[in-house]
Amino acid sequence: AGFAGDDAPRAVFPSIVGRPRHTGVMVGMGQKDAYVGDEAQSKRGILTLKYPIEHGIVSNWDDMEKIWHHTFYNELRVAPEEHPVLLTEAPLNPKANREKMTQIMFETFNTPAMYVAIQAVLSLYASGRTTGIVLDSGDGVSHTVPIYEGYALPHAILRLDLAGRDLTDHLMKILTERGYSFTTTAEREIVRDVKEKLSYIALDYEQEIETAKTSSSVEKSYELPDGQVITIGAERFRCPEVLFQPSMIGMEAAGIHETTYNSIMKCDVDIRKDLYGNIVLSGGTTMFPGIADRMSKEITALAPSSMKIKVVAPPERKYSVWIGGSILASLSTFQQ
């Protein structure tokens, strides 16, 4: 969250709400019945953490309201009734989700005006393009959105309910095979950190597995909060491989490369060349080292042989949706 015209968000915190799982015994500690974001993160050892947003759709509106309240009053320190608000959502989200968002903004926070933008479109804005196909992958949902001369092509938008949280869950599971047990909601956050710091995408998965078997070159160690050190090897690339092979976690979906290709194929034959040459990655789950090369390799294999494929992975892509929103909201034409 932040202000239009800024080049980076002022506040970045996880969309989590934590509630104590023990009864408070010390009086006057100012204990709250719920903690949001970073504060929930720092006290996670005694809390049960819940995510109000699942697969890009808000499933718990009371908690979502807490998160917005925290954003306005504690993080940005603004009165929401004095500022128009730009919110974002995943494409193909249920209409009811958007209506409820709007209702809460106007009725609870009394915002003077609001707009709900599609995430992927904002990422393309941020990359300085008007034509391209965006693969946006966050915590709960991934989607591919082809955009031509500023128009999103709704019939060709594809959505994949596979994203960061599923990768974290998968890593929790494969670390169990190594004899490390992570089960609680707080431990899941530790595994998420392991994923973000150590995972990478193999250019050739089968070959990487062979390398991992024979040498210890892929092994890295990670220190847990209690000082215990764990070693992680092939898990580093087995975790995000799920993006390309969803069948690894029992999902019947196409991988991100195939979804991108399918999305391009749903577009008019005349504009495909422009899309192949402008594949833009966005969102935290596209931050894995090696993703652009692998994506390029996989799509080259699917596309016509003479086609020029270009995968763009901007360094700020973790926040490119926000940056695009900042650009959009500061345009004078938009404000009218």
Curated annotation (Swiss-Prot):
Catalytic activity entry: ATP + H2O = ADP + phosphate + H(+)
Q: Which SMART domains match?
A: ACTIN (SM00268)
Location of this chain's protein in the cell: Cytoplasm, Cytoskeleton
* Family to which this protein belongs: Belongs to the actin family.
Q: What is its main location?
A: cytoplasm
Q: Which CDD domains match?
A: ASKHA_NBD_actin
What InterPro entries does the entry give? Actin (IPR004000), Actin/actin-like_CS (IPR020902), Actin_CS (IPR004001), ATPase_NBD (IPR043129)
Query: Which purpose does this protein serve, as stated in its record?
Result: Actins are highly conserved proteins that are involved in various types of cell motility and are ubiquitously expressed in all eukaryotic cells. Essential component of cell cytoskeleton; plays an important role in cytoplasmic streaming, cell shape determination, cell division, organelle movement and extension growth.
Q: Where are the transmembrane segments?
A: none
Additional information: There are at least 13 actin genes in potato.
- Gene3D superfamilies (UniProt xref): 3.30.420.40, Actin, Chain A, domain 4
Task: Kindly provide the name given to this protein in its UniProt entry.
Answer: Actin-66
- Recorded source organism is Solanum tuberosum
